[in-house]
């Protein structure tokens, strides 16, 4: 996991949230230790595996955010996982996503396109894949949050490595993809006429 890529996301968003994942079972009423810690910029959420326990002060130190820069970054720390997403490694509703061999840029955002098993399109900003660049193999799955909104679960083997809410598909994206589709059809017809 590339922490520098996560730092860049958080600084661009002006927001970082540390999230503590409590243990599965408490031990004899003692204050339970944190099982896993996560970090989010509000769109992507990544585990902080292999690092010591972080708090607001330590994440600012790691991200080189001094007192002068602190007003440009909202830092929060939640003692529990947010209720909408599923943070488990394996989820029975996981829908494998096929990454389309097609990337595009729209309004300055580089986009990755995925298709779910029903043929529906999911799009994420490419910058949210950067933390996974050190791994050769990652698989993506569609999950639904408690409100029925889709999000992408990124797995490395059987281990959850990130959760990403998709890019909103608006008119501009639909029109751009439609124009690409139409232009490709015209080009294919012209190629056929040459034969």
Task: State where each predicted segment sits.
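Glycine-centered loop/turn motifs
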Residues: 20, 54-57
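C-terminal functional regions that serve as terminal interaction/effector modules
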Residues: 41-44, 49-50, 57-195
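Intrinsically disordered, low-complexity linker/loop segments enriched in Gly/Pro
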Residues: 1-33, 38-42, 46-48
């Amino acid at each position: 996991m590339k922490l520098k890529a996560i730092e860049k996301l958080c600084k661009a968003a002006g927001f970082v949230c540390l999230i503590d994942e409590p243990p599965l079972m408490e031990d004899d009423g003692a204050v339970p230790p944190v099982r896993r810690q996560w970090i989010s910029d509000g769109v992507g959420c990544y585990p902080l595996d292999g690092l010591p326990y972080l708090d607001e002060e330590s994440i600012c130190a790691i991200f080189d955010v001094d007192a002068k820069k602190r007003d440009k970054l909202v830092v929060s720390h939640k003692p529990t996982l947010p209720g909408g997403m599923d943070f488990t490694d394996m989820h029975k509703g996981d829908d494998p996503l096929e990454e389309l061999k097609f990337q595009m840029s729209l309004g300055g955002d580089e986009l990755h396109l995925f298709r779910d098993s029903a043929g529906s399109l999911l799009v994420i900003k490419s910058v949210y894949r950067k933390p996974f660049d050190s791994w050769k193999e990652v698989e993506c799955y569609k999950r639904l949050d408690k409100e029925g909104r889709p999000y992408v679960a990124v797995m490395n083997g059987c281990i959850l490595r990130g959760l990403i809410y998709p890019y909103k598909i608006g008119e501009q994206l639909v029109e751009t993809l439609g124009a690409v589709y139409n232009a490709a059809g015209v080009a294919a017809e012209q190629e056929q006429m040459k034969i």
